[in-house]
Amino acid sequence: MQKKLIAAAVAGALVAPAAMADGHGVAVSGSIRTGVEYTGDDWQVADNYSRLRFKASSDLGNGQSAYMNYEFRVNSAQGSIVTGDTQRLSYVGIKGDWGSLSLGAQWSTAFNTVGTFIDKTNRYGGTGNTCIQYRMKNSVMLSTQLGGLSLMADAQMSTGGDTLDRGTVGGLFSIGGLSLGAVYQSADADCMGVAAAMNIAGIGISGGFTDTDGGDTGYGVNASIGGLWLDYETNDSSDGVITGSYGLGLGGGAKMILEVSNNGDDTMGIGMLRMDF
């Protein structure tokens, strides 16, 4: 009985805030992603970055609004919350017709403009993103839209580091079926990248190039048709990595995903059930 009461209390705690703050657009969502993985040496039941998310927004008047996002990573294979730096997203911001300003741990300008064209994997990608941060902690970001041109910039200011650890500017431009992205980052090791994507006769093609000042260059290309997706990524310090993925939607937010990857030495793979809510 006590366990049932606790479960009911937890469920009520999740639902009640959304109902009480409906005027502020509170929403609870997330994704659970669990599969059976072959690591190259062994088989295991593994989590694939499951998460629980809380979002809210509030109308400030004059076309302005405030918004926030809390996201917690969950290890669905072990039934635990995963802690540590930049496990998921956590930010607060203000937006209007002029654009948006946000602070916290958020998707970086480098990933939004270039990295996302290179790495579209569910688990095994990223070799070509030599100097691309995915989620960036201790960051402030400004973005705006000028017609078909999206401009964004961010700065990372971590405790104990330099006053400005990284400063990044980037942009996205779309014309017809072609999308282009570019980024430049000033850091201890400067970074630049370019990327593009287009659709030809139902086949989606994308890719990009990254270069680290005094370090590695890397690139990746990928193609998709229907639920099938193929990717090749490489950089100066590693062999090429080939990854293939197939996703089958089951309805109701559920999806079956099979992904296999080979880095020239080992083959890894995961068969995963994902459900978004």
What are these regions (language model features)?
Residues 1-277:
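Outer-membrane beta-barrel proteins
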